[in-house]
Each structure stands twice: as structure tokens, then as C-alpha cells.
Amino acid sequence: MLETPKVLLKNLQDCKIHFIGIGGIGISGLAKYLKAQGATISGSDIAISPSVKYLKALGVEINIPHDPKAINNQDVIIHSAIIKEDNKEIQRAKELEIPILSRKDALYSILKDKRVFSVCGAHGKSSITAMLSAICPSFGAIIGAHSKEFDSNVRESANDSLVFEADESDSSFLFSNPYAAIVPNTEPEHLEHYGHDLERFFFAYEYFLDHAQKRVIYKEDPFLKNYSKNAIVLEKKDIYNIQYILKDGEPYTSFELKDLGAFLVWGLGEHNATNASLAILSALDELHLEEIRNNLLNFKGIKKRFDILQKNALILIDDYAHHPTEISATLKSARIYANLLNTQEKIIVIWQAHKYSRLMDNLEEFKKCFSEHCDRLIILPVYSASEVKRDIDLKAHFKHYNPTFIDRVRKKGDFLELLVNDNVVETIEKGFVIGFGAGDITYQLRGEM
């Protein structure tokens, strides 16, 4: 059983909450949500980010970088998982005896009275959460990415029902109070949090599912296919007549689901149809079928997921994929998109590995995942995400792709410049380029750094 956090948030209208690491997508979502609930929010981070700018525009006082002077009369401190005990603001809060909560513990208070549609899995959870949010427009939403439908990762609502993207990386999904547990897959990742113990990892998913009133699962997953308790089940054979089209220049997937008829969803690929199907099945008890079918059309994608930045002489796509399974699936979508556009351009991949631990844990899979639909591979330095640097010979491991190694990429007008030692070594003026990574590659591709 989970231990209930000793500190609970209540009377939000009178509550002063300080977030350490407020620029992160998960923490910024909670900050926006609690501000809308009436709490007084402040925060800090190590650098300016789009989330920090957004919150500042809402009137949130944010210190860059962390500053112990920012800790004074707050009622509670909430910090992201990456913040360590020796953080100056954490130390100051302890001196002042201000209660300190991790994001994981804070979730219990925030969600305990909500009817939560909690989406968790290794891949696809942001898309499913955003799709379900589009299908159920009266529900609140907290997503780990920006929905293009409402241009935010948070949608406030007076409705008790909330669509929530849960996180397995720190086991915080176990604190999400799921009314409905929606799980597309359980591919092992973040095993360092689970002591590299697969039994412990899968037990967490089982606990998550067991404690929901409603369960929606994709039974092609090796773990989920053996889940024995009552659940709404999706299988690969339930999705058929998949077709890909351009509608007003935008990519869409058309498919039929079980005996429910045809659906149309933004995006490309079988995985896109699977994600949409799980969202649809999750909403069948909430809305009439035709409402679900029509509302799904409001989904316009999410930022950094097959995010088409431009489509002229240079087609440029930014994608968050940072795991081999995700990269392989998205490359298939890229090839489909190229075919729909009738372009003969080769697909150029710019890849920024995210975390040394993930790269090392999945190295053999990474070495294979570019083998299809990637005509040229360009490799950026590993984005460490605060991990200690490890020695790894990427040139040796990826030599079979004859890759180009660069220090960074820079957007210059409609072109991309490849740089080594701050010198431009190549300019890409036309073609089909897709960038992969969960680090700062997204800002490089957008010309924001």
C-alpha cells in the first residue's frame, strides 16, 4: 500500500505555494492548475524557458536562478523530481520549517477529490491524454505537453472529471487517484527508479490498474495481455481499414474501430490510430458515440510530437521521441507523410540522445532504430539532463550509418545551419528533416537558442 503524504494541500484560495523547478512541463502544469484553483504561486528555475515565460505572463513571480531569498512566508514548497536535498531553496525551507512536498506527494492532495482519467505508459501517453481531452471538452486536463487545441498543457474546468497524464518514471502515477486507468503499453524504462527490478516495475503498473474503477488497456503489450482483472480491451485486430490522407494540407489517419464505425484523427501511423482508439474507448461511458467522433476532430496534435514547423522547400519536423520504439514508429509516419506530399526528398534525421542512462540501457536498440526510413543521420552531443557524463564512442557504435557529427543546429530563416566549434559546416536549404530528442534540440530547430 502507498503511504499517504503527511502534508496535504487544502484551502487553495488562501494557500501560498512555491515551486522549485517550475519550468519543467510537469511542474508548470501543476502550477498553472493550482493558480486557476485560487492559490498564490511563486517559483524558481535555473533558466528561462517557454513555460517560465508563460507563467510570468500570468503574473507568477519566478526567480532565475534558484535563490534562498525567494523562500519566506509560503505555506508549502513543491519541487520537481530532479531537485536534490542540497538545493539552496530546500535548505532555506527546512530552516523556516516550511512543509516540503515532492511533485509526487503533491499529486495526492491535488487529485484526491477528482474523477481522474489517468493515462500512463512508456509511449503515447501525451497524445492519448490530449486526444481524450479533445473528446471530452468539459473535462479539466493536465498534460505533459502543450495541446495545440487549447495552446497549453492545462485546461481548467469546474467539472470534477479530469484527464491527467501520469508519470511512471518516478512512480508518481500511483498517486494519481485513477477513476479510469488507461495504459497503452508498459515497455520497461526508468528502471533506475525501480532498483533495476522488473518485478517491482510491473507490480507498480498492476497496482495502478487494480486501484482504478475502470481500466482501458492495449492487449498487444506483453504485460497487459496477461492482466486478468476486468478491463476494456483493445487488440490490434480491432482497428482496421487504416488510411492516410491530407486534409487542408494537414496529415490525418482514417480508421475503423470494432463495430463503432469510422474515425478521423490528426496525425499519421498505426500507433496514432491505436492511441485514438484507446481515447475513444475511455469515453464511451461519457458521451454519445457521434459526439466522440466529432470531438476527436478538435485534436490538432501536440507540441513536439510530429510537430510540423514548416513545409516549403525545407520540410522541418520536431519530435520528442527519445526511445528507440518511438523513433522507429515516428520514422514510419515521416515516410507516410513524405509519400502524401509526393516529395522525392531523402529523409534526414537529426538526433540528440537524451540521458546517458537511457542511451546505455537501450544502445543496441538505438543502433537499429534508424535502419528504416532514415536516409541520412546527423548526431548531436548527448543531452545529459544533469546526469554525469559517460564515455561512449558514438562514432564507433553508429558507423554503419556513416553519420555526420555536429555540435549544434541553428535555424536561420527557412534554412538549417549545422555547426561545429561555432563554425557553419553545412547549410540545409531544402529537403525533409526530422529532429528527435527530449532535450534542447527543440529550441535549436525553432531558432530559440
Curated annotation (Swiss-Prot):
One of the GO biological process terms: cell wall organization
InterPro entries xrefs: Mur-like_cat_sf, Mur_ligase_C, Mur_ligase_C_dom_sf, Mur_ligase_cen, Mur_ligase_N, MurCDEF_pg_biosynth, UDP-N-AcMur_Ala_ligase_MurC
Catalytic activity annotation: UDP-N-acetyl-alpha-D-muramate + L-alanine + ATP = UDP-N-acetyl-alpha-D-muramoyl-L-alanine + ADP + phosphate + H(+)
Enzyme Commission number: 6.3.2.8
MF (Gene Ontology): ATP binding; UDP-N-acetylmuramate-L-alanine ligase activity
Pathway assigned to this chain's UniProt record: Cell wall biogenesis; peptidoglycan biosynthesis
Gene Ontology CC annotations of this record: cytoplasm
Record keywords, A-Z: ATP-binding, Cell cycle, Cell division, Cell shape, Cell wall biogenesis/degradation, Cytoplasm, Ligase, Nucleotide-binding, Peptidoglycan synthesis
Highest taxon in the source lineage: Bacteria
Compartments where located: Cytoplasm
Annotated positions binding ATP: 121-127
Keyword flag Glycoprotein: no
NCBIfam families cross-referenced by the UniProt entry: murC
Record family assignment: Belongs to the MurCDEF family.
Function: Cell wall formation.
Protein name as catalogued: UDP-N-acetylmuramate--L-alanine ligase
Gene that this polypeptide is encoded by: murC
